[in-house]
Amino acid sequence: MNYFPEIQIRTIQPSDNPDLALIVRNTLSEFGAANPGTVFFDPTTDALFELFQTPNSAYFVAEANGKILGGGGIYPTEGLPEGTCELVKMYLLPEARGIGLGRTLIEKCLETARENGFQQVYLETLDELHLALKIYAKFGFEYLPAPLGNTNHFGCGLWMLKRL
């Protein structure tokens, strides 16, 4: 198990964009999921700080000793039902997995969604990200038969929803 004695969770800064884009793309490549219709090819992956200036959105970065370990956020994706946001761009470096950091980031995102007045959190994911699926299920996310909203991530074949 890896140990990071002083992990900080903070909001995204402009200088985080390159590191976070690399973490997202490397993770998808690692799991064989660097496919069209995923965030791998989404241009916003290179401009997360700018994306998360949208009202009622938030992105949290996990950092230890000046090194970005990953992050995750919420976003009011177009076309989602009223009162619903999306859990987005939740990715961690390999050495930052299995230490509870993903759980901490999800908790922070869900808390922020509640504070922003959302009643539901939606997410899209892939079969290949099987470790994440287990965590989402533990948080009470339930599978949906079809996607919600207009994410344009046609490569994501699993959709989940959690009521807050």
Provide a role label for each language-model segment.
Residues 3, 23-26, 119-122, 126-164:
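C-terminal "cap" of GNAT-fold acetyltransferases
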Residues 3-7, 11-95, 106-108, 112, ...:
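Acetyl-CoA-dependent GNAT
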Residues 9-17, 118-127:
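Generic detector of contiguous secondary-structure segments
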Residues 18, 99, 158:
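Glycine-centered loop/turn positions within well-structured domains
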Residues 67, 80-81, 93-107, 114-116, ...:
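Conserved glycine-rich acetyl-CoA-binding loop
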